[in-house]
Amino acid sequence: MAKGRVAERSQTEMLHSTPAGDRAVGTQGSAAPGNKDHLKEKPCVEAGSARTSLLILVSIFSCAAFVMFLVYKNFPQLSEEERVNMKVPRDMDDAKALGKVLSKYKDTFYVQVLVAYFATYIFLQTFAIPGSIFLSILSGFLYPFPLALFLVCLCSGLGASFCYMLSYLVGRPVVYKYLTEKAVKWSQQVERHREHLINYIIFLRITPFLPNWFINITSPVINVPLKVFFIGTFLGVAPPSFVAIKAGTTLYQLTTAGEAVSWNSVFILMILALLSILPAIFQKKLKQKFE
């Protein structure tokens, strides 16, 4: 019992003393020489204050919102009714109304519609704003399946990576203050799967064990490399996106987002989640056998 408390205390101290900057972002190897010492010499600068972080976050959000405004302004001239429907969908009715507008202009203004979809999806993912599930369903309605799947996976990977970098830049004070205990527990899991981190990230993206927003903001704090994070996310969101996109082909027959998921699709997702983690399990067993 005492050993367990000591181990947990050690993990907590490590979480505060060795943020993601201790490793080269996007690599899985050791940190660059001198980088670790430099961070330890300036803990206050590394952690930052919650107020400063909030100001930076608001500034970044304002800039991103302005970019979204420019994207919207570059859209073709819309009628009053169409402008009302040009919003982030919150339910299936909103998604249907938005799909109707976008499908009308998709062929004539293909690039503008694609850019608007791309930018909106990444914006929602970056700032952990709900609504991306409806955009995933909408992609199946607007585009051919291969393009829709690639688009959703790319947007999810980029958006989650931007959220990762945002957390790396300004989110650590929030993690330290409000999510330390949960982050420590996940850090222990990450260390156990360090050799198969991509498989583990894929597994987490397929399954609902950890919320996506939690994975995004804590990953840089517990030394998940950005490259591994992006690849794991890009591949991991493919199976659930497959289900959502397939449902989008029958958009106007759906009344809720829950109808996009059947028991059959849940079973398939469970099988894929198991397959994603099997290489790590088998290699661990073989390693134990030969040792």
Curated annotation (Swiss-Prot):
Coarse class of the protein's main subcellular location: endoplasmic reticulum
Bilayer topology: Multi-pass membrane protein
Subcellular location: Endoplasmic reticulum membrane; Endomembrane system
Positions of region (VTT domain): 140-251
Transit peptide in keyword set: no
GO BP field: autophagosome assembly; intracellular lipid transport; modulation by host of viral RNA genome replication; nervous system development
Swiss-Prot/TrEMBL catalytic activity: a 1,2-diacyl-sn-glycero-3-phospho-L-serine(in) = a 1,2-diacyl-sn-glycero-3-phospho-L-serine(out); cholesterol(in) = cholesterol(out); a 1,2-diacyl-sn-glycero-3-phosphocholine(in) = a 1,2-diacyl-sn-glycero-3-phosphocholine(out); a 1,2-diacyl-sn-glycero-3-phosphoethanolamine(in) = a 1,2-diacyl-sn-glycero-3-phosphoethanolamine(out)
Gene Ontology MF annotations: phospholipid scramblase activity
Entry-annotated residues carrying Phosphothreonine: T18
TM region(s), chain numbering: 52-72, 109-129, 147-169, 197-217, 225-245, 262-282
Record keywords, A-Z: Autophagy, Endoplasmic reticulum, Lipid transport, Membrane, Neurogenesis, Phosphoprotein, Transmembrane, Transmembrane helix, Transport
Domain of life the protein comes from: Eukaryota
Quaternary organization: Interacts with VMP1. Interacts with COPA, COPB1, VDAC1 and ERLIN2. Interacts with ATG2A. Interacts with SURF4.
UniProt record similarity statement: Belongs to the TMEM41 family.
Domain commentary: The VTT domain was previously called the SNARE-assoc domain. As there is no evidence that this domain associates with SNARE proteins, it was renamed as VMP1, TMEM41, and TVP38 (VTT) domain.
Annotated function: Phospholipid scramblase involved in lipid homeostasis and membrane dynamics processes. Has phospholipid scramblase activity toward cholesterol and phosphatidylserine, as well as phosphatidylethanolamine and phosphatidylcholine. Required for autophagosome formation: participates in early stages of autophagosome biogenesis at the endoplasmic reticulum (ER) membrane by reequilibrating the leaflets of the ER as lipids are extracted by ATG2 (ATG2A or ATG2B) to mediate autophagosome assembly.
UniProt name for this protein: Transmembrane protein 41B
Gene source species: Rattus norvegicus (Rat)
Gene: Tmem41b
